A protein has these predicted regions:
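Hydrophobic residues embedded in beta-strands of well-ordered beta-sheets
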Residues: 28, 66-69, 125-127
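A surface-exposed beta-strand-loop module
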Residues: 4-65
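Short structured motifs
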Residues: 27-32, 80-85, 111-114
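Short Gly/aromatic-enriched secondary-structure transition segments
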Residues: 1-3, 61-62, 114-119
Length: 168
């Protein structure tokens, strides 16, 4: 079930090809042609827009801290579908996610996974985060504000892992 009362699905793509779909109430039904075999792993991109609502512990917050804008999510336990089209069931996990956040260039965007890119386009920046482990929809999160980013590393056995800390 997709609880997207405040979100409008613009289009759905698979392998960069548009797919037909219906979006009625909280259900997004995608037509695959040819049909997928049960158990097949595949990927689709859902493009959407809107003004998210906020439920639970504050699933989508647009606020300020010390006079500076901040947007953040806290989706536990069922608030994820307030701000992104997902199957909001605690036991269901996506095998991976890519998050693209378009935000004012004066700010930084943090999310799950590893930062892939920050592409500045005038007054806006597109930040791409990639997470490649199974994840429940309520654990997907992002935040945007005037972060200061500290880049460090941590030794895990013989592997030197990068570690980024976002502070404000």
């Amino acid at each position: 079930d997709l609880v997207t009362g405040f979100l409008i699905v613009d289009s759905v793509k698979r392998n960069n090809q548009l797919l037909t779909f219906t979006h009625i109430d909280s259900a997004l039904n995608i037509n695959f042609s040819p049909s997928l075999t049960v158990g097949t792993l595949d990927s689709v991109s859902v493009y959407y827009q809107g003004s998210p609502s906020s439920t639970g512990f504050g699933s989508f917050i647009d606020d300020t801290h010390a006079g500076t804008p901040v947007i953040w999510t806290l989706s536990e336990p069922y608030g994820s579908a307030d701000w992104w089209p997902c199957k909001s069931q605690l036991g269901d996990k996506a095998d991976s996610i890519d998050i693209y956040i378009i935000h004012p260039s004066a700010y930084k965007a943090a999310s799950n996974g590893i930062l892939q890119s920050e592409i500045v386009n005038g007054s806006q920046t597109t930040t791409h985060w990639k997470h490649r482990y199974p994840i429940a929809s309520y654990l997907v999160a992002f935040a945007v504000t005037n972060y200061v980013v500290f880049n460090n590393s941590v030794m895990l056995g013989s592997v030197n892992l990068p570690m980024q800390t976002y502070c404000y």
